Every structure is written in structure tokens, then in C-alpha cells.
Amino acid sequence: MAQLTKNFGKIVKTLTIPHLLNLQIDSYELFLQKDIPPTSREDAGLEGVFRSVFPIEDFNRTASLEYVSYEIGEPKYDVPECIAKGLTFEAPLRIKVRLVVYDVDEETENRTIRDIKEQIIYFGTVPLMTEKGTFIINGTERVIVNQLQRSPGIIFEHDSGKSHTSRKVLYSCRIIPMRGSWLDFDYDHKDILYVRIDRRRKMPATILFKAMGMSRADILRYFYEVEHFTFEPHHVFRQVLPDFYRKEKAYSEIRDSEGKVIVAVDKPITKRAWRLMLEAGIEKVEVDPATLLGLFLAEDLADPATGEVMAEAGDELNADLIEKLKDAGIVELSLLHTRGVDTSSSIRDTLALDKTIDTITAQVEIYRRLRPSSPPTPEIAANFFENLFRNPDYYDLSPVGRYKINARLKVDQPLDFRTLANDDILKAVKHLTFLKDSHGPADDIDHLGNRRVRPVGELVENQYRIGLVRMERAIKERMSLQEVATLMPHDLINPKPVAAVLKEFFGTSQLSQFMDQTNPLSEVTHKRRLSALGPGGLTRERAGFEVRDVHTSHYGRICPIETPEGPNIGLIVSLTTHSKVNDFGFIETPYKVVKDGQLTGETIYLDATREIDEVIAGANAPLDENKAFINSMVGARIRGDQVVIPREQVTLMDISPSQIVSVSAALIPFLEHDDANRALMGSNMQRQAVPLLRCEQPLVGTGMEGAVAKDSGSCILAEGEGFVHYADAERIIVCYDDPAVGTDTGSAKTYELLKHHKSNQNTCFGQVPRVLVGQRVVKGDVLADGPGIRDGELALGKNLLVAFMPWCGYNYEDSILISENAVKDDTFTSVHIEEFEVVARDTKLGPEEITRDIPNVGEEMLKDLDDCGIIRIGARVAPDDILVGKITPKGETQLTPEEKLLRAIFGDKARDVKNTSLKVPPGIEGTVIDVRVFNRRSGEKDDRTRQIEDFELARLDTKEGQHAAAIAANVRRRLWPVVSGKTVFQTIKGVKKGEVLLEANHPMTQEVLEALPVKKLSGLFTSKETNEAVAEVLDEYDRHIQFIKGLYDQKREKTTEGDDLPPGVIKMVKVYVAVKRKLNVGDKMAGRHGNKGVVSCILPIEDMPFFSHGRPVDIVLNPLGVPSRMNIGQILETHLGWAGMELGRQLAEMVDSGKAMEGVRDRAKAVFDTEETTALIDGMSDDDLRDALRALKNGIVAKTPVFDGATEDELWSWLKLAGLPEDGKVTLYDGRTGEAFHRPVTVGCMYILKLHHLVDEKIHARSTGPYSLVTQQPLGGKAQFGGQRLGEMEVWALEAYGASYLLQEFLTVKSDDVGGRVKMYEKIVKGDNFLEAGLPESFNVLVKELMSLGLDVDLIQDEKKIAKAPPRR
């Protein structure tokens, strides 16, 4: 039955939210390509790494180890087994390699194949991802966080005038590869261009150009326009070039062929005049000879007679040189154009600094700069330079880098060309000089077009590459040390370096994190998180404000709200609801395409770069029925700026208003009315909400709750159409119609439900079935709710009746006053599971033993332990109770003669062991819910282990029987159309004696088919075709039964076999204790708007403020917490929740009071008032409508999507409809006196969460406990069972009060006076409470410290021994 909800959203959804875990799951699937045949795999992920590292050749090129393919096996243990046993969820990886041995001809160096050996080699294990997008590493669930990193490619920057005292803006360019040397071009304040390779010493950039094979003239001609001048006696002419216009004054009259003056003397040559000159065929114009001075030669000039070089390209022209050239008879000059507004002589000036003369010297110079230690030969230098940027083994731009360079420099190289071409470098420098000369804008490094996401698949791929490169070195060494012809591939390959790198990455990397598993929302947001930290990223100390700030390109891609509050603010962010990551790693967001002011119905995903030139309208721009803009002027965004423009210019439109925020922020109703800081706190605190004993979905939601619940993986969803064959609290079995679902298991799938599962944060995760036996389900239906989920929707807190008013100071400073009902009814009770582990080891003195026979322990302490010394399930335990009894052998101590005698007479060895039992730590009180015992494979099993095994085997038998019955039910369903009405040729007898189910020659009925065992249907019918059809189905049935039998046999085998325990461990026991945490004073609570507080008082229900009709409120909040925090969303939620609560109650009452259904139906339509819900109500029968309205007795669920929610008018109209005051205020009465409060109070319904900051886990009390070894002072902190620190400020306070005896007690016997502590204990025992303080241990520490500095300090007890100082003279 559909739940009736009121949706206040106006914008029609045209695109469903992509699966929230797609990024993690798809990325790792692409990395593994597990189910793709080896021949069809893409050159990416694991396949790409193997292809890039192999083939591996030896140094003499006599052998080559080639990669063929890989295969990934099935994991040995499933996910629950890995978590229980503390193992890694992984699968074996095997690679097929080929060792080719060659014969090399010494003269020609040609190779011929001598031998080929192919082999499949075990290559370690590879961690697998669970269906929820997590990894199980050593039994703990971890998440690999996606990294947000600077994209490979090219970037142009400037320093904004901050680098040099002259405040001159210095431009730079950087080419960043995925792997290889960085290339930086930087201008200095003198306009000299330098290059740095790998951020080493800088050198003139022209050295790099020369190393690339360019001459001085080539360099100058590439970067400058060339002008041609001609000397004639007493005149200098410049050639007129069609595509080279210069604005200057005419030196002499310019006439056309007819003598008509085009430009007069000293008049400027305009563009029109230039065009007339070209039309008139004028090829040269006279210029002032003085203009040549200071220009630079474009090429070398040689004496025509002798061939001697008179001037080199780049030399400056002066009067002497001009005369020299004229004397030599040179009449034509090619000069560089360096005097334009946007041209400068920077490249020529750099060339003048460059002392290298040709390619070889340039390459040698680069080698020297990068490898200063060894002098190179030209061949080594040339090879080194070639490897820098042109060898794919050493330099890899990656497809992303090539794509970015192609787009920025407008070059057209294929994406698989992943090294640097000369053209790339030259165009980059040319663009850099253009930016410098024209003072153009630099690239924005914080723009999302210049930052990309490295998802989990790519991060693991990089680790594999590191490991394989290490392995490659070892293989090459082995090939050179041994005779390759006698070796097999497995002799060369050792996968340990790869395994070590992977283990380090998954276990200790900054990006491999312990999953935040407080509730399903915290899981989802952790998997959708992007981190700028980690290897190859930023560090929080060095990250500036700009990189942390919200950027216009984040719109629709990265949430501007959700980020941590501490030092990581802005460095750790979240993906928005609709965003995707494309193949290049850039974040994309969806838009609707607009043409001529009308939507085309097409949806496209764009990254931040491709969006730059688009004009994008907001999602809430009003449209008519033809999906055209109603208003002629529309609000839109261009390059991040808000503008109002004609509708015809709009090219795109937002998909949804919620596309700009993340999942957590999209769960906050009326987010648009909250201050950004409080919204940030609200989205962060929802992740800390503890799943409660009884969940309740919010009365005021946003519509995102269902998507989060279903995509989190905490719910169990139906995989297709079918019916529920079996359902209980442990498992659900669904029989599917589609044979493709559960192919091996006869289209019947068993779903095991989680029960009392301990999460990473110790919260209790359990699943509750939501379907009944026989119920039809379709794909995506919720079969079972997870923790913090109700009816397939996220439900983290409770709907409470709230009043905003002060109450005797108990809600001062955000404190919360709450009704005793919340504790009595277990409203905010949550269950937390603590895991305790004890290990029995083999020690040098003998083995430890887990036993009930513990020395010096009374029977009372052992009452809940079984014969093996392990606590029984269901036992209530308190601090210091024994969970598992364990004794450890003691070292031999010196015995007195009397003890030796007794030992010899009675043979008493019992005192040789000490009690090392596992006890309940302080602050934990609960019930034992599970015990797991792990034994060595070869070890003997105790009674408890056998008992657990027997119970598990019985469960497996039951499960197998239920699964087989489900397969049989599916078979009967498939057979019924085949056998319906078909006659049987023999009488069918029942189980009971003499019972006949069906006489011979009678048609088959449904009842008989259900009563008959499936196997007995074989050959039962008179029709041959029917028997054949039945036999075909039964063959399939046999195959499925055999498959599940094999499956359960494997599970039985695993249950009875021992465990792989670490070396030296005999037995391990894990005990799980469920702790019930009721709401307590000091617990932290919060709403969804950043309105957090601590419970200050739990008030008896009779003292709570109450309404005129007698109902008390549940919670009282401080009204002063709203105005200054500016989170008005909580007030709007309160009003809307109150209206929904009241309207739901009224509709349920109308049904229960027996009112005419016609009136009830009309009232329901008036309340819900949307086309969709009205149609749903009209389509319901009276009985269905009654049931649906009765379900609303606690309130109507209202959905108010972010930025598209309920307006004030709608809110007021709902309050009016419910018969409530429109201002949301009523008069309340004091529960203690019964008198009305002086002013009306804002009341309503608010969704309140209990956060994972529980007072029971924070506060503890110490009388005596552990002391520090050095200072002998009590330790600090709850974990060490430490004491409260008494610092110097507290000492000053006690001094101020003159409490000298108290102070002496604090500083001596209560702290570090060891002797005094013992004496104090004796005095208390005797009843003599007299303080006798000694010397604090810290004083002795001070004395020893002074001694270590060479100062001998003696403590003199007797005054007479004090030496008197001699009198001063």
C-alpha cells in the first residue's frame, strides 16, 4: 500500500539521481575487469599496468618475459566470514606469461627465437570490493577516499606582482605529466625566460630549444614576425607584406602608379591606406634609416666576398654595423619585429644570455644541470635528453594530460600520443610570451577544469605499477645472473614486492580510511568524499585560503556546504547529488538543453571546462506547458556570474535545484533559509546520528531520504519481479520470475539479514524484514530495512513536539530540556556493541590456558562461565566481571625453605599461574549477545567450540532445506502452465495410508501439484510432449539442487575446520556485549539545521509545559538560539511539522469516528492537493483509503526539496487548514503551577537526532588506578583510567582561598607521594584520618634532572649541618 505524502516541490524531475556509490564501484570494476574475457579487456586498470611493464628484457636482449593475460579466482571466504575471522576479502590473481629465449647474431645483431615457454603463475591476491563499495582489510571495513588532485596537462600562471620588489607581474607556465619530469617556464623581472626541469636549477629556455634541434635563426623566426628592408643610395625601404600591417607615419609621400597621393608625408598609414597601397601594387615604402637602430637580425649575415659571418641572428643593429654591412655590399636585411604593442624582445634577450652553440652543447648542458656529478659524452647526453620527454617508459602525460594540452594549445594530437612533441613545447612558450606581452589572464588553478578526481581504481592501479616496477628490476637482475635457457617463468617472477606495496597502501595510506559507519548516511558520504590531501596532494599546513574556498566551477559538482570544520576545511569536500566523474576524471553535472528559449528534452553532462561559454538558466525559471520560458528576461549564469538576459540567448538549464548540494545537505528541509555555517554543521551532524532502537522517518523531509537508504546498501532490495517464498527475522527467500536472476540457484535467492552486527563505530546494525510470505515484489522494492531506516527511507531521529521558550535557566546556552517520557518510552534508546578479545598464547614458561579454574577467584565471579571458562550468551555483565577465564604461567620465584618443604610434600603447583582473565572494563554494563571461539586447525576443540559448531551446522541444514523448498516452489510455478489440465496415467497416492490424491486418467489440479514431491512428476502424464517438457524442467531442478548442496557442503566444511591463527596463538575468543544507552543528562542532541545542544535536565512529564487540551510538549529549546545563528529553517520545519502532525491526526480521527467516506475523501484531497496524490486517492477503494489514512495518525509526511520547497503562503495555508494559529504560537501552561505562561509560545514538531557523543562514554570516575612510572603521578584520560589534572591555575585558586591543608593533600598523597599513599591507606583502615605527607616523587625527578646537568644536589635534613655563608667584607 502506497504511503500518502505531501510533496511541496514544483519542479518536475526529469532525471533520476545516479546511484550514489557508482564512482567507487564502477572505478574498481574497470580496474579489475573481472568478468570480461582476457581478449576483450580494455588497456586500463590492471590490464593496462601489466601491458605497460611487460615485456621485460634482459640487458643483453637474449630473453624476453612477455605478459599474455590474467585471471582472478573466487575468494576463499565471503564478507561476513572475513569480518568475523579478521581476514582480508581478496581473491587469488594468476597471470599467464611467456618466456621467449633468443639467439643473437654477433655480427648483424639480429635475433632469432630459440625457445618459448608459457606458464600460468600465482601472482598473490588482489583485494575485492564489497557490493557496498568498501574493502575488508584484516577484518575491518575500510574506504578508499577519492583524491582531488591537480590535473596533468598545461597551466599558465602569474604571481600577481608578489615575487619581486618592483611589483612587476611575472608569468610562468608549467607542463605536468602523470609520470615523468615537470617542465616549468618562468619569466624573471628582466624579462628573461628560464626553464626548469623537475624543479632543479633554472637555465635560459633557449638551451631547451637548441637541444630540440633548433638553430638561433629557427628560434627567432618561430617567435617573431620578420620584416625585410632594402638599402638604396641615401634611402631605406621596407617591404610591404599583405598580412603584416604596422601603424606608423609615412617618411615620404606614398603614391600609386598614376601618381595619386595615398599617404602624405608625416601622416599615419591607416588600415584603409594600407589596403589602397596593396591594391595599387606598392611593394615597398621608404622608412627613416634611424628606425633600423635597435632592431635585431633575424638570420646570420655573411660577407658575400669572403663568406665570413659578420653578424649572428639576434645581434642588435647599430650605426657601425649598418655601415659595415653597406661597405660589404649587403643591400637586403631581415629584421625581427620587436616594437609592437604586444611584442617584446624577451626571447632574443634570453638567446643572448645562452652560451651554448648547437644541439650537442645544449644537450650536454641540460645533462650537467640535472646530473651535476658525472661528466657526459654527447651520446649519453643525447640519450638522456631523449628519455626526458619523448620516451613513453619514462614520460607519460596520460590521456587526460594530452586532452588538456590539445585543448589549451589548440593542437590536434591523438589521445594515445602521451609524450611531449617539440610543437607542444614551442606553442606553450609562444602562448606564454603572448600572455606576458599582452598582460592576458592566467589560468585559475582552483577551477575544476584544472583539478581532477583520482578514483579508487586509479589509486590502486598506481600502487600496482610501483610494485611491478620494483619487481621488474629484480627480474632483470635474475635474468643476467642465471642461465635463462634453463629457467621457467616462475623462477623469475616473485610477486612479493607487489603484495608489500598493496598491503602498505590498503593498511596505512592516508586515503585508505577506517569507514565511518555510525549510520547509513555516514557510510554514503564517506564513499562520496573527495580529499585534496594524501600522496601527491596538498598538506593541510601549506594549503592556502584560495584552494579551500568555494569556486564558481563547483556549481553542481562539489557541495559548497559539506566540509569539515577544523584544519581540513575546504580540503575535504563531497560530490553533489547529480554529479558524475567522466573517463578523464573531471566532475560533470547534468543540464537540460535549451534552443530558442525552449527545452529540447535532451539532457547532457558537462565538465567545468566545456561549460565555460554556456549560458545557463536556473532550475526554477518558470516554464509554460510547451516547456518554453514564460519570462522574456531570464536569470542565468555566464562564467559563474549572475546575469539577466533575453531567453533566446540561454543555451542550458539546471536539472534540479538540489544538484548544487551534496547528499547530506540535500536532506535538510528549508536549507535555503539557513545560514551557510549552520547548514554545514547540520549536514555534518546528521552523519553522527546514532541509529535508535525504534526508527521514525521525519514528518518534514526533502525527498532524498529514499535514495540514500536504498543506495547505501543497508537495505535489502528485490532484484527483479517475483514473490516472497519465506521471511523471518533471520532470512528472506524470494522466488524470481526471471531465470537470469539467481541462475545457479533456480531463480530463488536467499538474503541473510544482519542481526546485532557491530559497526566500526560500535553502533548496532540490524535489518528488519518489510515483506510478508506470498507478497509480490518488483525490482527495487525494499525487502528489509537497515539500521536508521524505516519503510525504505532514512530515519535517524524522532519527531518531537517542541516549544521555544526559556524554562528556569535549564536551556541556557543551547542546553536542552526534555521530557521523562523520552527515557521511559525508550524514544532515544540506542544499542551499542562492544567487542572484547582474549588470546591464549604459547609463552616461554608454557602455554596460557582458557579455563574456569582460576586461582583466588570466588564462585560468585564464575557463576556465568561455562566449563571451558567462557561466559554464556545472555549473561548480564558489569564492570570487572570475568568474560573469559585465562591463566598464564608465572616465572619461577625464590621460595623460602618452608615453601619448598610444603611444595615437596603436597606437590602443589597451583600457585605457579597468575590470573590474566578478560574482564569487563569500567563504564560498560550490558548483555553478552555472542561468543566466537577460534582454534588452531590442528588443535583440539573444547566443548564450547563443538556447541557453537553444532548450532551453526543445524542452521545450515535449515537454510538448505528452505532454499531447496523455494526452488521446488519455483519449479511448480513453471510447471503449472505445462501440466494444467493434463491427464495422469496412474493413480497418485498421498503420504497417509490409503490416501488417494488423484485417480488415474484424471486431469492434474493445482492442489495435487502443490502436495506432490517435485521428483514424482517425472513420467506421470499420458502425453509424451508433457512428460518431455516436465523432464526438461526437472533436469534443471536437479542441477540447481546439486549446486546448492555443494554450496552448503562447502559452508559446513568451513564451519568445522579450524582457523588460521597468528604464530604462537593457541586459541582466541571474542565476546560481544550489547550495551543499552538510554538518554542521559549530558548527551548531545541536534536538529538538522546545525541547532545542537546538550541535555541539561530530564523533567518529569507532569512538570513539562502543556497545551490547553492537556498534552505536554516533549522538548523545550532556547528561543535565543535562533536569531543569532540565522538558521530559520528550524522554525519553518517546526510550523510545517505541526501542521502535518495535526492534519494526520484529524484524518485518522475522521476515519475512526465512522464519518462518511465521501467527506473523508474530499478532506484528504484538500489536504494533499497535488495532481499525483489526488489521482492516487481517487484510485483507492474505501478500505484501502481507510488503512492509508489510519497510518497517518502520527502525522503526514511532507516533502520540501531544497531550494524548491514549501513557500510561506503554503505553510500558512496548511496551518489554517489544520485549524492552527497562522503564526504557529499558542498559550502554554506551566506543568508545576498550572498557570498560563505570560506570552504565546512557538510550538510545533521538529526532527531531533541523538548524536554519537554520549556522556556514558566520556565521563568516568577514578579512586585509585595506574600511575606514571617516572613521576608516579596518576595517568590522564579515560582510556588509561586516569585522574583529573590539578594544574597551576587550580593551585592559585586554592592558594587564594588559603586552603593549605587541602593543597598539601592534593600535591602529595593524592598525587605522587608514594610512601604517603601507603601510610594514608593504613590510616584509613585503622580509622586514623590524619595527614602525614612525605616528599613528592616529582621532586626526586627534579633532583635527578639537575644531576644530569652536572649539579650535585644534597638534601640536608639537619639544620645544624647547614653551612653558614661567610660574612661580606
Curated annotation (Swiss-Prot):
Superkingdom of the source species: Bacteria
Name of this chain's protein: DNA-directed RNA polymerase subunit beta
Signal peptide residues on this chain, from the entry's feature table: none
InterPro entries hit by this protein: DNA-dir_RNA_pol_bsu_ext_1_sf, DNA-dir_RNA_pol_bsu_external_1, DNA-dir_RNA_pol_su2, DNA-dir_RNAP_su2_dom, DNA-dir_RNAP_su2_hyb_sf, RNA_pol_bsu_bac, RNA_pol_bsu_CS, RNA_pol_bsu_protrusion
TM region(s), chain numbering: none
Family: Belongs to the RNA polymerase beta chain family.
Gene3D superfamilies: 2.40.50.100, 2.40.50.150, 3.90.1100.10, DNA-directed RNA polymerase, beta subunit, external 1 domain, DNA-directed RNA polymerase, subunit 2, domain 6, RNA polymerase alpha subunit dimerisation domain, RNA polymerase Rpb2, domain 2
Lineage: Bacteria, Pseudomonadati, Thermodesulfobacteriota, Desulfovibrionia, Desulfovibrionales
